[in-house]
UniProtKB/Swiss-Prot annotation:
<feature type="signal peptide">
    <location>
        <begin position="1"/>
        <end position="33"/>
    </location>
</feature>
<feature type="topological domain" description="Lumenal">
    <location>
        <begin position="34"/>
        <end position="83"/>
    </location>
</feature>
<keyword id="KW-1133">Transmembrane helix</keyword>
<keyword id="KW-0539">Nucleus</keyword>
<dbReference type="GO" id="GO:0043069">
    <property type="term" value="P:negative regulation of programmed cell death"/>
</dbReference>
<keyword id="KW-0407">Ion channel</keyword>
<dbReference type="GO" id="GO:0005640">
    <property type="term" value="C:nuclear outer membrane"/>
</dbReference>
<dbReference type="InterPro" id="IPR039492">
    <property type="entry name" value="TMEM109"/>
</dbReference>
<comment type="function">
    <text>Functions as a voltage-gated monoatomic cation channel permeable to both potassium and calcium. Plays a role in the cellular response to DNA damage.</text>
</comment>
<keyword id="KW-0406">Ion transport</keyword>
<protein>
    <recommendedName>
        <fullName>Voltage-gated monoatomic cation channel TMEM109</fullName>
    </recommendedName>
</protein>
<feature type="transmembrane region" description="Helical">
    <location>
        <begin position="136"/>
        <end position="156"/>
    </location>
</feature>
<keyword id="KW-0703">Sarcoplasmic reticulum</keyword>
<dbReference type="GO" id="GO:0070062">
    <property type="term" value="C:extracellular exosome"/>
</dbReference>
<dbReference type="GO" id="GO:0034702">
    <property type="term" value="C:monoatomic ion channel complex"/>
</dbReference>
<keyword id="KW-0256">Endoplasmic reticulum</keyword>
<keyword id="KW-0472">Membrane</keyword>
Length: 243
């Protein structure tokens, strides 16, 4: 029971991490392809861009998903998401063009080169789509790095706890063997215990806070469930009294 309760959160985290890695690779692959088409100079748009590592990984992930889900289903999902993303990008592009015109008029009224300064706000739908894809990929990578960092810190916390216990036991044994005077032994043992308690407090404060927050959330769910049961019992009693 304990092993299953410990391994199930780790399994969920690993599954989420793998899923988010696949999503991040697909988004980065789409963003790379889109950015080459929209931000490349006019003379270089017709040339075939060199295939980099991210593009190769994205293609391999796409091939794996085609094998798992099916090419038709994957093509349907890709086309639907592309249409939705293109509609959103077109709306944002129209808004940026309108904002560019307003900013240009205001800057021209102030005596500045408004048309030149507001030129950067005129983004095509493809460019907006590229920004959205890269932004989504960056958010996914940030979430993935946060998850991996949390797992690494949790693992390091357990390793440090074991190392701290081993050092304390070694110091205790060395203290008992090397110090014959009982008073000096008691003082050194007290100092060792204080040091161990301080290290436990410093290393376990974050973990204890997270555990306390999880316990509070569990208690809140239990309270809500009890309230729901009380309301249901009260409604049942009222219906019985009415009958």
């Amino acid at each position: 029971m304990a092993a299953s309760s410990i391994s199930s959160p780790w399994g969920k985290h690993v599954f989420k991490a793998i899923l988010m890695v696949l999503v991040a690779l697909i988004l980065l692959h789409s963003a790379l392809a889109q950015s080459r088409r929209d931000f490349a100079p006019p003379g270089q748009q017709k040339r075939e861009a060199p295939v980099d590592v991210l593009t190769q990984i994205g293609r391999s992930v796409r091939g794996t998903l085609d094998a798992w889900i099916g090419p038709e289903t994957m093509h349907l999902v890709s086309e639907s998401s592309s249409q939705v993303l293109w509609a959103i990008s077109s709306a944002i592009s129209v808004a940026f063009f309108a904002l560019s015109g307003i900013a240009a008029q205001l800057l021209n009224a102030l005596g500045l080169a408004g048309d030149y300064l507001a030129q950067g706000l005129k983004l095509s739908p493809g460019q907006v789509q590229t920004f959205l894809l890269w932004g989504a990929g960056a958010l996914v990578v940030y979430w993935l790095l946060s998850l991996l960092l949390g797992l690494v810190l949790a693992l390091l916390g357990r390793i440090l706890w074991g190392l701290k216990l081993v050092i304390f036991l070694a110091g205790f044994v060395a203290l008992m063997r090397s110090v014959p005077d009982p008073s000096t032994r008691a003082l050194l043992l007290l100092a060792l215990l204080i040091l161990y308690a301080l290290l436990s407090r410093l290393t376990g404060s974050r973990a204890s806070g997270a555990q306390l927050e999880a316990k509070v959330r569990g208690l809140e769910r239990q309270v809500e469930e009890l309230r729901w049961r009380q309301r249901r019992a009260a409604k049942g009693a009222r219906s019985v009294e009415e009958e």
